A protein has these predicted regions:
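C-terminal peripheral helix-coil segments that are non-catalytic and often amphipathic
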Residues: 165-220
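Hydrophobic alpha-helical connector segments
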Residues: 72-99, 153
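Amphipathic alpha-helical segments used for helix-helix packing
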Residues: 94-116, 130-134
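Short, Lys/Arg-enriched anionic-surface-contact patches
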Residues: 2-10
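Short, basic, alpha-helical segments at the C-terminal edge of helix-turn-helix-like DNA-binding modules
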Residues: 61-67
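Amphipathic alpha-helical packing segments from all-alpha helical-bundle domains
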Residues: 113-139, 150-165, 183-198
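Helix-turn-helix
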Residues: 12, 20-58
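N-terminal positioning helix adjacent to the helix-turn-helix/winged-helix DNA-binding module
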Residues: 9-16, 152
């Protein structure tokens, strides 16, 4: 029997850890549970990840790389259709790593590395939203005073960051279950883009309402 390469074992550990963290919340998942779920000894888990924080940090590194790559696409947003797709894709990535957002304050209070890196995440999100607003302004899709851009971008990032927390508080037992993903992501994208409604050109505003209606009907 061919033994699995250590690299593959390490990746499998991260995959299962992410599933457990997302399902139960990071504070409720021990390394003992992780090793039991994997069917490996605690010592084998320790060989690859000597501490729970190393699991968390490795998962965050994956999330941060994927996020930064996605945020670079903000330069290509020109209208409401682009913005809707961009925001929905962002929420899909956030959903994949939703335990970070469910347990964010607890994680930040215990993990200094995560604390500093999440500050960079917020800055990069804000920078990307500003780039999106700039692109939409140049095409006439939005008409926004430059003095309002900073506050509007910040408000959009706040909703992006805490939307899943809101969903969880509203319905703790079901909100973050996989079968509820589509509806939660649609609501998140809708509420972020609703912050642009006062600034949208009339036809763009109508198109946003059309998109929201179409996706809501499809999610039912």
């Amino acid at each position: 029997m061919v033994k699995k390469a250590p690299r593959r074992t390490a990746e499998r550990i991260l995959e299962v850890t992410l599933e457990l963290f997302n399902r139960f919340g990071e504070p409720n998942v021990s390394t003992t549970l992780i090793s039991a779920e994997l069917g490996i000894s605690p010592g084998n888990l320790y060989y690859h990840y000597p501490a729970k924080d190393e699991l968390i940090n490795s998962l965050f590194d994956r999330y941060e790389r994927a996020l930064n790559e996605l945020l670079n696409a903000s330069d290509g947003v020109r209208d409401v259709e682009d913005a809707w797709f961009f925001m929905h894709t962002l929420f899909e990535l956030i959903w994949q790593y939703r335990f970070f957002y469910r347990d964010l304050n607890d994680l930040l209070s215990k993990n200094r590395r995560l604390e500093t890196h999440f500050q960079s995440v917020l800055k990069n999100k804000t920078r990307a939203v500003k780039a999106m607003l700039d692109g939409m302004s140049r095409t006439g899709a939005v008409h926004i005073d430059t003095r309002e851009v900073e506050a509007t971008a910040t408000s959009m990032v706040v909703v992006l960051t805490y939307w899943l927390s809101f969903e969880y508080v509203r319905d703790p037992r079901r909100a973050l279950e996989p079968e509820n993903a589509q509806a939660a992501l649609l609501r998140g994208a809708q509420h972020v883009l609703n912050l642009l409604v006062p600034y949208l050109e009339q036809s763009q505003r109508a198109h946003l309402l059309k998109l929201v209606g179409a996706y809501n009907n499809g999610a039912k």
